[in-house]
């Protein structure tokens, strides 16, 4: 476009420069006014010094400085083959270059040497488009040779996000120890720790004598606390190769204490192991299952909520309708225990246990409880599940407790609670299981804290006027146990160390039969029933979040439907390996 000014018109011919370049290329092809030939092997291409000097700093320095090439008729370019030289000259005179699988590497190397940054980046972009799990490790090495940060970043991203496929490639076995350490130790590695361990052992055994000395340092990159204890027990703890290393033996013993000891871990190394964060690829998902939906009968629905997308997703339905079952998460699986199995015309108190795998999106039967029960409470600690109280087959209030060992797949009876209660708030903190409040068989509130010492299998109780919750969940939030509502708007935070309660910001409504869980250090409360100002009871679809940092509540919108007496859980997994978006 022409530009007018006070003293005239500025004319711009936008085709002039491209036409000029086209004419110069025509002169080159006709060998008119050419004054230098650049050579690769026996291949000689006549060119114009001024065009070459204008095209890159490399040629400008060659022809405009005191180098001998300034006056030579022929200039030999070492390290460049004839086809690549043709591509470079074509690019200089036309601004175009054909990049393909068979020439991208020599063209990229030549572009780097001759200082053509845009051509170099074009080659990098082409290689990035060809990245796959099978070649990304090789591309990382290539990018380091070529000093190409954009390619290196993209190739590493593929290597991290496609770890299971990369681990199966031959290139992994060819990494040096330092490269493997940086790879396996990266927070962004998208893979389960079991696969990380397996990849490490494959690498070591590929050249055992030369690589055995790196085993201790590399074994530290496996985040053992996120490995399924059964896998650790069967495949890691007694591995002969690891046991041959005294340093690895210490790591193994530390991990064993952390995973399997019911006593508190006070060893400094064990504390360090305990506090290594999960990899960034792990995400927390909120799970809602069972309960009563839209004032109707008990539902089999299972819903997953992603905080990242704000979307709800339906999962495989519960195998049967269960009224007032309990549910927990353990080792990235969901366990649903007991409940009253509701079918057409019949209702039976169940001792069944159903286990859900998010990766398979499937339910399976687990080892049944010793006693059939519903309206009970369950909680998990380390490798154990505790199932507490409830109502038995004879509709009697039970004070019994049983414990499931997920490694040995067995249930055993434990000490009964001092006072049998229904619908208490339950949480585990610092090797102790806490039962807050609840109600007796006559539906009178029980103002007690009942505490179970896990390693001693013993109970004690404390009376308190602070407790009056019924049908309220409890969660561990930081160093405190938070009791959420229970026929009240009140939120109480209990500090086990000081045995004191702190009142937090109230909920909007008086709520009961709701669910609560923790994701990312925040409390999420779902559904339930609420008491209106005129003392009517309404089912709720509310979805609220409490931030302990600011002591404030915010609405997260609505659940897909009204729901109460449901389970509300947090399940941690890697979306890519679990079929999630």
UniProtKB/Swiss-Prot annotation:
Gene Ontology biological process terms, A to Z: proteasome-mediated ubiquitin-dependent protein catabolic process
Keywords recorded for this protein, A-Z: Kelch repeat, Repeat
The keyword Glycoprotein appears for this protein: no
Kelch repeat copies, ranges: 285-332, 334-383, 384-431, 433-479, 480-521, 523-573
GO MF annotation, one: ubiquitin-like ligase-substrate adaptor activity
Database matches in PANTHER family: KELCH PROTEIN, KELCH-LIKE PROTEIN 38
Protein name (database record): Kelch-like protein 38
Organism: Homo sapiens
């Amino acid at each position: 476009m022409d530009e007018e000014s006070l003293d005239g018109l500025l004319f711009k011919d936008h085709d002039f420069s491209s036409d000029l370049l086209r004419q110069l290329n025509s002169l080159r092809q006709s060998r008119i006014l050419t004054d230098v030939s650049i050579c690769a092997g026996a291949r000689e291409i006549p060119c114009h010094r001024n065009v070459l000097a204008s095209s890159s700093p490399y040629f400008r320095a060659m022809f405009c400085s005191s180098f001998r090439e300034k006056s030579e008729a022929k200039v030999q370019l070492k390290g460049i083959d004839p086809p690549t030289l043709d591509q470079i000259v074509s690019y200089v005179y036309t601004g175009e270059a054909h990049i393909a699988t068979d020439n991208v590497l020599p063209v990229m190397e030549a572009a780097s040497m001759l200082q053509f940054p845009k051509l170099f980046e074009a080659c990098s972009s082409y290689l990035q488009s060809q990245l796959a799990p099978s070649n990304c490790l090789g591309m990382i090495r290539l990018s380091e040779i070529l000093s190409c940060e954009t390619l290196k970043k993209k190739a590493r991203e593929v290597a991290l996000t496609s770890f299971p496929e990369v681990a199966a490639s031959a290139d992994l076995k060819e990494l040096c120890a330092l490269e493997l350490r940086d790879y396996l130790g990266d927070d962004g590695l998208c893979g389960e720790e079991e696969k990380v361990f397996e990849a490490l052992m494959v690498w070591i055994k590929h050249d055992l004598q030369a690589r055995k000395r790196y085993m201790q340092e590399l074994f530290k990159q496996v985040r053992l606390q996120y490995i399924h204890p059964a896998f650790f027990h069967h495949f890691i703890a007694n591995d002969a190769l690891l046991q041959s290393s005294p340093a690895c033996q210490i790591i193994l013993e530390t991990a064993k204490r952390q995973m399997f000891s019911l006593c508190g871990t006070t060893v400094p190394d064990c504390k360090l192991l305990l506090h290594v964060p999960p990899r960034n690829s792990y995400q927390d998902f909120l799970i809602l299952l069972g309960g009563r939906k839209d004032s109707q009968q008990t539902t089999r629905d299972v819903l997953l909520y992603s905080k990242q997308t704000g979307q709800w997703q339906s999962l495989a339905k519960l195998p049967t309708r269960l009224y007032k079952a309990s549910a927990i998460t353990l080792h990235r699986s969901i366990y649903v225990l007991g409940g009253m199995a509701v079918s057409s015309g019949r209702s039976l108190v169940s001792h069944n246990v159903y286990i859900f795998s998010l990766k398979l999106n499937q339910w399976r039967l687990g080892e049944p409880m010793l006693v059939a029960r519903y309206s009970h409470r369950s909680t998990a600690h380390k490798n154990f599940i505790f199932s507490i109280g409830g109502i038995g087959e004879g509709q009697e209030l039970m004070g019994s407790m049983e414990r499931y060992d997920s490694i040995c797949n067995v249930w055993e009876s434990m000490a009964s609670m001092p006072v049998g209660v229904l619908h208490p708030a339950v949480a585990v903190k610092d090797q102790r299981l806490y039962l807050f409040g609840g109600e007796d068989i006559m539906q009178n509130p029980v103002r007690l804290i009942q505490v179970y010492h896990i390693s001693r299998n013993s109970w004690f109780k404390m009376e308190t006027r602070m407790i009056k919750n019924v049908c309220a969940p409890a969660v561990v939030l930081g160093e405190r146990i938070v009791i959420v509502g229970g026929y009240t708007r009140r939120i109480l935070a209990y500090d086990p160390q000081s045995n004191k309660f702190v009142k937090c910001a109230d909920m909007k409504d008086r709520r009961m039969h709701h669910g609560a869980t923790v994701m990312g250090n925040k409390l999420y409360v779902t559904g339930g029933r609420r008491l209106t100002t005129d003392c009517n009871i309404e089912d709720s679809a509310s979805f609220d979040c409490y931030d302990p940092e600011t002591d404030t509540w915010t609405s997260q919108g609505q659940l897909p439907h009204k729901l109460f007496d449901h389970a509300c859980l947090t399940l941690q997994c890697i979306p890519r390996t679990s079929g999630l978006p």
